[in-house]
Amino acid sequence: MTRCTRALLFVLALFMTAAGCGLAAPGGSDAEPKVTILGPWTDEQELQFKDVLNGFGIPYTYQGTAATREVLLAEVQAGNPPDIAILPGIGELVEYAAEGRLRSLRDLYEPTEYGKPWRPGAEGIRDHLWMPLKADLKSIVWYRKGEAPQLRPAPLASWCIGMGDDGASGWPGSDWIEDLILQRMGPVLYARWATGDLEWTDDRVIAAWDAWAGMLARDPDRAGRMLLADHRGPVGGHGLLLGGGCDLEHQGSFARAFYGDRSGEAAFEDSARLLPGGPYTVRAHEVSADFAALFGEGGQARELIRRLASRDAQEEWGRKGGVFSPNAAVPPKKGAVDKEVSRRFTDQRVPLCLDASDVMPAAVRDAFYEAVLLTMAHPAEPVRPKLTDIQNVQKAQKANQNGKPHPLTGVCGRPQ
C-alpha cells in the first residue's frame, strides 16, 4: 500500500466517522453488537493484535490508524466515540478524563502487576481510568550486528533519520530532544519539564536542543532530506537501518517491526554515549506505552479490556506479535535482543521515564513537533524563539483550564 493510499484511506475514515459509519471487521455476525476499538496498530501489527482479540470470542470491530488522536477527536465530536480507545498520548486521555468521558477500569486489571511509571496519575483526576497494554523501550540506538559503534557521539552522516509518518510528523525528532534532556539533566528535571513545571526557555533545555541542532547544522542538506524521509523507510523495504546508507538509528524497540524478516540482523546499544554533546552516563531510560481507556459502558467492552490485560493474553501477544508487556507478572521474553530490552524494563538501578511528548497536552505536543520540524529545516537558526513559542502555547493551555490544570504524576520511577 502506498503512502498516498494510506492518506486517502485516513480521509475516508474521517468522513465515515462523521457520518456515523462503522468499519467492517471480524469478530461476529453483522447482527451482533460489536465492541468498537480504535488503536494505533496497522498492517502486520494490526493482524497480530486481531489474532489475540479473536481468541476472546467477543464480537468486535477494530480501526487501526497512525492518526489515533485525530480520528478519536472526530468521533468524540460526532457523538460516536469508540468503546475502547488505545493511545500512546496519555496527555490526551487526561483531557478526556477531565471532561468526564472515561469510565473506570477498576477491577479489570491487577494494579500491583504494573510498577512505575506504567500507571501515571493526574492531579484532580480519579484513578483507574487508563491502563498500559503494550510497552516499548527508547533511549537506545540500533545498529547492524557485527558493526557495533564506537561509544562516542557520531556525525550526522552515520544516523538513519526520517520525520515522515501517516499521522502527526515530528515525533522521531522529539525523541532525540527528550533523550538529550533525560541524559543531560536526569529524571527529576525531565519529569518537571515533561509536566510543564520547568519552562521550555530554561537554559538547560535550550542547551540540550542546541546540541541536536548543532549536529544537524553540520550538514543542512542531509538534514533537509531526513526531514522528508519516512521514518519506516521505503514501502516494502527493511527500514532505514537495513536499507543502507546509514549505520545508526535512534529508535524505540518497535523499530524491529520496520526491519521485517531481517530484524534478526539488528542489535542495540544505550543511546547516552552516542548522543550529540556526549558521551553521557545513562541516567534513565525513556519508555513509551499504548494506554487503553474505556469510553463505552457495555459489559462486553469491559470484559474485552479485562481479557487483554490478563497475564495469559499479554504473554500470547508478546509471543505472536513480538511486543513487550508492562505487566511485571509476564515472564521475560527469550532471545538475546528481547532479553536486553526486558532487562532494562526491570533493572531497579536505572529509572524509567515515560515519553515526554506523550505526557504533554495535545496542543503543547503539536507545538513541540512543529519546533522540531522547523529546527530540521533551518538548523543554524537560534532555537530560543522556537522554544518561546512552545512556552507561550503551554501558558495558554494552562489558562484555558481555568486555573485547574491536571499535571501527570509518576512520570518517572524505578521499576518494581
Where are these regions (language model features)?
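Extracytoplasmic/periplasmic solute-binding protein
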Residues: 131-133, 153-201
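Conserved N-terminal structural module of periplasmic/extracytoplasmic solute-binding proteins
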Residues: 1-92, 397-416
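Glycine-centered hinge/linker elements that transmit conformational signals in sensory
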Residues: 194-232
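Short helices/loops that flank or line small-molecule/ion binding pockets
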Residues: 69-81, 99, 153-155, 231-249, ...
